[in-house]
């Protein structure tokens, strides 16, 4: 049994959270959304969900987290170091890896815990460029449930796709409900209201 699955099973054995999840094919690649992302604990739950499902997954983290002495452990747990100064390069790199057959689920938390300004669009661009399905993972403290919801295919019609996403997350509160933001990409906002585009 892998280190990640062992850690996940230990987590669920003692956790107060209830795992309510749909099945996801283990032998495929995809994007796994973790939302609402209102606390760092949301991300821990997403990793535990993916580990329990025995998915081969990776996640993105600040490059500073991968320095000694914890860098090796972070990579063993599926971490990919990210230099946020070059988000476009990261999208290209991940898309190329998947196209070459490096199949894995990429855990993404597009809603930053500090911004409160909606979702970043990196997950959408990666999913479209690599033709990957998107699985909607969730955290809902009001019911103390968490897990994987439906898997969708993005069509390229951003407002329509995000309407599907918003419908699913409408009753999901995250770990800290007061910090929840509406799932909305900047690309949905009219140009005159959008301000400076977010490269990530």
Task: Set out the residue ranges of the language-model regions.
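Non-catalytic C-terminal accessory region of glycerolipid acyltransferases
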Residues: 3, 7, 14, 87-200
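Short alpha-helix boundary/capping motifs
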Residues: 1-2, 39-40, 64, 116-117
């Amino acid at each position: 049994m892998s280190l990640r699955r062992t850690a996940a099973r230990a987590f669920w054995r003692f956790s107060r959270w209830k795992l309510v999840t749909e099945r996801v094919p283990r032998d495929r690649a995809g994007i796994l959304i973790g939302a609402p992302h209102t606390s760092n604990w949301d991300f821990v739950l997403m990793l535990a969900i993916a580990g329990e499902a025995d998915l081969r997954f990776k996640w993105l983290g600040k490059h500073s987290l991968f320095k000694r002495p914890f860098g090796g452990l972070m990579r063993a747990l599926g971490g990919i170091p990210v230099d946020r100064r070059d988000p476009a390069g990261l999208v290209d790199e991940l898309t190329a890896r998947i196209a070459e057959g490096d199949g894995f689920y990429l855990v993404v938390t597009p809603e930053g815990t500090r911004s409160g300004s909606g979702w970043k669009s990196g997950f959408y661009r990666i999913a479209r460029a690599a033709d990957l399905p998107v699985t909607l993972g969730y955290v809902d403290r009001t019911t103390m449930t968490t897990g994987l919801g439906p898997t969708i295919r993005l069509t390229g019609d951003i407002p329509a796709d995000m309407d599907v996403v918003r419908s699913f997350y409408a009753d999901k509160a995250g770990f800290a409900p007061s910090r929840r933001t509406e799932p909305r990409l900047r690309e949905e906002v009219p140009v005159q209201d959008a301000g400076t585009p977010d490269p990530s």
